[in-house]
Regions:
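Short Gly/aromatic-enriched secondary-structure transition segments
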Residues: 29-37, 203, 208
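Beta-strand segments within the central parallel beta-sheet cores of soluble alpha/beta enzyme folds
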Residues: 55-56, 96-102, 132-143, 265-266, ...
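A short glycine/serine-rich beta->alpha loop
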Residues: 8, 27-29, 65-73, 103-111, ...
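Alpha/beta catalytic cores of group-transfer enzymes, especially the acyltransferase/condensing modules
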Residues: 131-187, 300-303
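Glycine- and acidic-rich phosphate- and metal-coordinating loops
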Residues: 84-109
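C-terminal nucleotide
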Residues: 2-17, 42-78, 86-89, 93, ...
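DPxDG-like acidic metal-binding loop motif
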Residues: 36-39, 111-131, 312-315
């Protein structure tokens, strides 16, 4: 790509995230606990003085050049283009842009690469003079993903990558988006390994329908005694959301107390609920979680929306390398991401 020689290059880098606990509750009024990871996305942007955006990446297939006001095309570049269209509405930019994306985040691994691309693009084009906070950018990124991309996600991923710093967890109350940044204890090691689709929308719709039938705004607030009015599938989804909301709150307490054993136990309970009630795990992930714990992890669980992808494990640093070697011996195709 070529841009006018006098055009200024703007860049921004944001981390990916792993959700330690609090799955499927960011749109149900629960508290979530994502942690920023070192793998990151960097976006470089330069005005090209045309009416087209030209977007490229070494990690994602196919560069794209498209008119600045074109609709989404179901291409990875839509995440960049949605952010650029938002920026034009805010009068942050006007002409077409040359954009290059460098990503160390594995695609489809449940690490929020889409949210990271949108937030990084917004940060790159945000004028220094704009009174726009990172929280504002997170809300804008969610709106872009909901409306331009068409994914009915919650706010967790955008807040995590906009505000998070590697080595800290974000205790986020999704009712009002109040949050607390918590340092991860030095005696804890979080490891993520990798082994999406319309099923996310289906599970989300089931949660919303369960809340409607029970008569509550937030499913996390539902009384477990009222699950009898739901059919079996909706009752299972509600049971997970209610119990996961309580686990997340307990996990924040355990993190503050540096109680690794309790935190790990909550992770295991979370995975079991995601497997049995939310029905978003798969046999290969279940075995990986079981082996991770069998070999000495305090806890492990599937992370992200589910249906494969990644697990996250809590491991004593003193046994980390031996534990990883033994787990790799049982599952040769896994990759250690962080």
């Amino acid at each position: 790509m070529t841009s006018p020689q006098n055009a200024i290059m703007h860049s921004a880098t944001v981390p990916c995230r792993v959700n330690l606990i609090g799955e499927w509750i960011d749109f149900n009024g629960g508290t979530v606990l994502p942690m920023a990871l070192a793998p990151s996305v960097t976006v470089d942007i330069q005005a090209n003085q045309t009416t087209s955006d030209r977007i490229s990446s070494a990690q994602f297939e196919g560069a794209q050049g498209v008119a600045i006001d074109a609709p989404a095309t179901h291409h990875w570049a839509d995440y960049v283009r949605g952010a650029l269209q938002y920026a034009r509405k805010q009068a942050w930019i006007s002409t077409g842009q040359d954009v290059h994306v460098e990503s160390a985040i594995p695609v489809g691994a449940g690490l929020s690469s889409s949210a990271a691309i949108i937030v990084a693009t917004l940060k790159a084009v945000r004028p220094p003079s704009a009174s726009v906070t990172d929280t504002d950018l997170a809300f804008a990124a969610k709106d872009i993903e909901n409306t331009f991309i068409g994914v009915p996600c919650g706010i967790m991923d955008q807040m995590a990558v906009a505000l998070g710093k590697p080595g800290t967890a974000l205790a986020l109350d999704t009712r009002d988006c109040s949050y607390e940044l918590l340092d991860m204890p030095a005696s804890w090691t979080i490891v993520q390994r990798a082994l999406s689709d319309g099923r996310y929308r289906m599970r989300r719709d089931e949660c919303l329908e369960a809340a409607r039938q029970i008569g509550t705004e937030f499913l996390c607030d539902a009384n477990p005694d009222k699950l009898g009015v739901l059919d079996q599938a909706l009752a299972s989804r509600a049971r997970h959301v209610i119990s996961e909301g309580k686990r997340s709150q307990e996990a924040v307490v355990a993190l503050r107390a540096e109680d690794r054993a309790r935190f790990g136990h909550l992770m295991i309970e979370s995975h079991n609920s995601l497997r049995d009630d939310m029905d978003v795990s798969v046999p290969g992930i279940d075995q990986l979680v079981a082996d991770a714990v069998d070999l000495g992890a305090n806890g492990a669980r599937i992370t992200g929306a589910g249906f494969g992808g990644c697990i996250v494990a809590l491991v004593d640093p003193a046994i980390l390398e031996e534990w990883w070697r033994d787990l790799k011996a049982r599952h040769s195709k896994i990759e250690r991401i962080a």
